[in-house]
C-alpha cells in the first residue's frame, strides 16, 4: 500500500465511476480496464482496493504509448486512476458529498446500437445534479455488422482498417448519440474532433469485449483530469475525509464499512465519526484492511491484509466497534483531536438531516437502503413534481404506513410508499393491506418512479370515469304521440331521444324549466337499458309529481335537468368529453335555466 508521500501535499488519483443503462456493458468495460491494469502493471504494484481498482500511472503510460503519434503532448502526471468497482448509479448515489459527489469524473456507457435508454437519461440527470463531468463510451462497436475487430488497439488505429461503409454506419450511430446528448442539454462530438473539452462532451467509440478504443478512453480521462482538475486532486497529510460505500458483515470481523477516502490520511487507532441510523457514530479504527494480492491468497489467511495507514484516494475496509447502525452514503471523518469530536458530530448530523425528510405536508413516503439512494429517489420524485412527506433509510415500518394513510385521506395519489431496495416489515405489510396503502418496491430507481407514475395515471383515469359517471349529461327527448302507457305514479311513456343521452336516475324538466320527476327505468321492448342515445326510441318510467295530460302531453319536448355544479364541470374540466349533439343540447338547457338563475352556466375567469 502506498505510504504518505514526501512533503505535505500530493496529487491523488481521480475517482472514476461508470454509469449507464442495464446490459449496455458497464461491468464488461470495468473488467476490461481491470484486466489491462493487472496485465500491464509493474511487479509489486497493487491494483485492487476495497470496492475500487487502481490503474497505476505505469499502466497508463504503456496504454497511451501507441497514441503518442496522435497526441504528442500527452504526459502522465497523476499517480493513476481509481475506478469504483460497482457500476451503476445506485452505488454512485452513495458517493455523495455536500453539494456534489466524491466522484471526480464519470464514464457514461451507451450501447451504440441501442442509443439512449431510460437509465442513460437518468444517469445524465444524476451527473448533472451532482455536477460530475463525464465522457461517453459508445460501446459495442464490434456489434456493427461487418466490423473487423482488432483486439486492444486504439480506436484511431482500428477505424483505419474498416470498410468505408462500416465507417459511415459508425458515423450515423455517433450522430444519433450527439443528437440525444443535445436533447439532454449537452454539446457533444467524437473525442478526436472536440475543440474545447470544457464545453463539449467527448464520445469515445469502444468495444469492452475486444478492448478497441480503451486506450483512448483511459488517455482521455487522464488528460481531462490533469488539465481541468489538478486543484481538486491536491490532497495532504490532513485527517482523512471519505464516504461510506457499503456496510458489510465480515466473518470474524463483525460489521465493517467499505469506504472511499478522497482526502487526507487515515491511520489505525484514529477516532472517526460516521453517520448512523439514529445518530452519528464515534468510534476508533481497529483495523484498516486491503485485499490480499491474489498471488498471496492462502485459504487460511483470509481475504484481507491489515495496513497501518492509507492515503487518498483509496478504497479501504474499516473494522471498528459500534458500526452496526452505520449508513451507506454517509460521510466519514477522521477527528484531528478529542476536543473536535462535537464539531464533527454536528457536521455529520447536518449532512444526514439534509437528506432525510419529515414534514406535515401531503406527499409520498420514501424508504431506501442507503443515504445515497434515498437522496437519488427523492431527487427523481422532485423532477416529476411529486411531493414527499417523509424520506428515511431503513425497512418499511407500520409508522410509514400510518404517515402514508394521512396523505391518502387528503390526496389518494400521494397515499403510497416508495420503497427502494428495502424490506417491508410483516406488521407494516398487514397494516398496509388493511389501510389499502399501496407500496411500490423496486431496485431500479427509474422503474420505481415509472411504476408509480403509471399507477397515478390509472388512478386519475378511474377517478375521472367515476366523476363522469356521477355527472348528469345533457339529454333532449320528445314524447311520442300514441305512446302514453300510464299517466302517473309512475308515468310510462314512449319517447324519442333527439339529442344527447338519458339514463335511469336523471331528473327531467320541461321547456320552461319546471322539474317533472326522475327517470326510473328505460326499456326497449323486453330489454332494460342502462342508457338511450340520440336516434333511439324507448319507453321510460318517470317517478315524481307528474300527470300526463296536465303537466306534459304527447309531442312535448323534455330535457335532463342538470345541476349548476355539473354544468360548470361540463363547461370546464370535461368540455372535451361531450359529443357535438350533447354540446348543442347543453346550450339549450343553459338558455332555459338562465331565466331562473342568471349565473347558471357562467364560467368565471374564462
From Swiss-Prot:
It comes from the Archaea. Keywords: GTP-binding, Initiation factor, Nucleotide-binding, Protein biosynthesis. Residues 45-49 are annotated as: G2. Residues 20-27 are annotated as: G1. The keyword Protein biosynthesis applies. GTP binds at residues 20-27, 85-89, 139-142. This is Probable translation initiation factor IF-2. It comes from Staphylothermus marinus (strain ATCC 43588 / DSM 3639 / JCM 9404 / F1).
Amino acid at each position: 500500500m502506498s505510504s504518505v508521500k514526501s512533503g505535505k501535499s500530493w496529487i491523488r488519483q481521480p475517482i472514476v465511476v461508470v454509469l449507464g443503462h442495464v446490459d449496455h456493458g458497464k461491468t464488461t468495460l470495468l473488467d476490461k480496464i481491470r484486466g489491462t491494469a493487472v496485465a500491464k502493471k509493474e511487479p509489486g504494484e497493487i491494483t485492487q482496493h476495497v470496492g475500487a481498482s487502481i490503474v497505476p500511472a505505469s499502466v497508463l503510460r504503456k496504454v497511451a504509448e501507441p497514441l503518442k503519434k496522435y497526441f504528442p503532448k500527452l504526459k502522465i502526471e497523476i499517480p493513476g486512476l481509481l475506478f469504483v468497482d460497482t457500476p451503476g448509479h445506485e452505488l454512485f448515489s452513495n458517493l455523495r458529498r455536500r453539494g456534489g459527489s466524491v466522484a471526480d469524473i464519470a464514464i457514461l456507457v451507451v450501447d451504440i446500437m441501442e442509443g439512449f435508454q431510460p437509465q442513460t437519461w437518468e444517469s445524465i440527470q444524476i451527473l448533472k445534479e451532482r455536477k460530475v463531468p463525464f465522457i461517453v463510451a459508445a460501446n459495442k462497436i464490434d456489434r456493427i455488422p461487418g466490423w473487423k475487430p482488432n483486439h486492444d488497439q486504439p480506436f484511431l488505429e482500428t477505424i483505419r482498417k474498416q470498410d468505408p461503409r462500416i465507417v459511415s454506419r459508425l458515423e450515423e450511430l455517433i450522430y444519433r448519440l450527439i443528437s440525444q446528448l443535445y436533447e439532454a442539454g449537452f454539446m457533444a462530438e467524437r473525442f478526436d474532433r472536440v475543440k474545447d473539452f470544457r464545453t463539449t462532451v467527448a464520445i469515445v467509440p469502444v468495444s469492452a469485449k475486444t478492448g478497441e478504443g480503451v486506450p483512448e478512453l483511459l488517455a482521455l480521462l487522464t488528460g481531462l483530469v490533469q488539465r481541468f482538475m489538478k486543484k481538486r486532486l491536491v490532497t495532504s497529510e490532513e485527517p482523512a475525509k471519505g464516504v461510506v460505500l457499503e456496510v458489510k458483515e465480515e466473518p470474524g470481523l463483525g460489521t465493517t464499512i467499505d469506504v472511499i477516502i478522497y482526502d487526507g490520511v487515515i491511520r489505525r487507532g484514529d477516532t472517526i465519526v460516521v453517520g448512523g441510523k439514529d445518530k452519528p457514530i464515534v468510534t476508533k479504527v481497529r483495523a484498516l484492511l486491503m485485499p490480499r494480492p491474489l498471488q498471496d491468497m492462502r485459504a487460511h489467511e483470509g481475504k484481507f491484509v491489515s495496513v497501518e495507514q492509507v492515503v487518498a484516494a483509496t478504497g479501504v475496509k474499516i473494522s471498528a466497534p459500534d458500526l452496526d447502525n452505520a449508513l451507506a452514503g454517509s460521510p466519514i471523518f477522521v477527528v484531528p483531536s478529542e476536543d473536535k469530536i462535537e464539531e464533527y458530530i454536528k457536521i455529520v448530523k447536518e449532512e444526514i438531516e439534509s437528506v432525510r425528510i419529515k414534514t406535515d405536508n401531503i406527499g409520498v413516503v420514501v424508504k431506501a437502503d442507503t443515504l445515497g439512494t434515498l437522496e437519488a429517489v427523492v431527487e427523481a420524485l422532485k423532477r416529476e413534481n411529486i411531493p414527499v412527506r417523509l424520506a428515511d433509510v431503513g425497512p418499511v415500518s407500520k409508522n410509514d404506513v400510518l404517515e402514508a394513510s394521512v396523505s391518502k385521506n387528503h390526496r389518494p395519489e400521494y397515499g403510497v410508499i416508495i420503497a427502494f431496495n428495502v424490506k417491508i416489515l410483516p406488521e407494516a405489510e398487514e397494516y398496509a393491506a388493511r389501510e389499502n396503502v399501496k407500496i411500490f418496491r423496486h431496485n431500479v430507481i427509474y422503474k420505481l418512479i415509472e411504476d408509480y407514475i403509471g399507477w397515478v395515471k390509472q388512478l386519475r383515469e378511474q377517478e375521472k370515469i367515476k366523476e363522469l359517471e356521477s355527472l348528469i349529461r345533457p339529454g333532449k327527448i320528445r314524447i311520442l304521440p300514441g305512446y302514453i302507457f300510464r299517466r302517473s305514479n309512475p308515468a310510462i311513456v314512449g319517447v324519442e331521444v333527439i339529442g344527447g343521452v338519458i339514463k335511469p336516475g336523471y331528473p327531467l324538466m320541461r321547456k320552461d324549466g319546471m322539474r317533472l320527476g326522475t327517470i326510473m327505468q328505460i326499456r326497449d321492448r323486453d330489454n332494460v337499458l342502462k342508457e338511450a342515445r340520440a336516434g333511439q326510441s324507448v319507453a321510460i318510467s318517470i317517478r315524481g309529481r307528474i300527470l300526463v295530460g296536465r303537466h306534459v302531453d304527447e309531442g312535448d319536448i323534455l330535457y335532463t335537468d342538470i345541476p349548476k355544479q355539473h354544468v360548470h364541470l361540463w363547461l370546464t374540466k370535461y368540455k372535451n368529453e361531450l359529443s357535438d349533439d350533447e354540446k348543442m343540447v347543453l346550450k339549450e338547457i343553459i338558455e332555459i335555466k338562465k331565466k331562473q338563475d342568471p349565473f347558471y352556466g357562467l364560467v368565471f375567469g374564462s
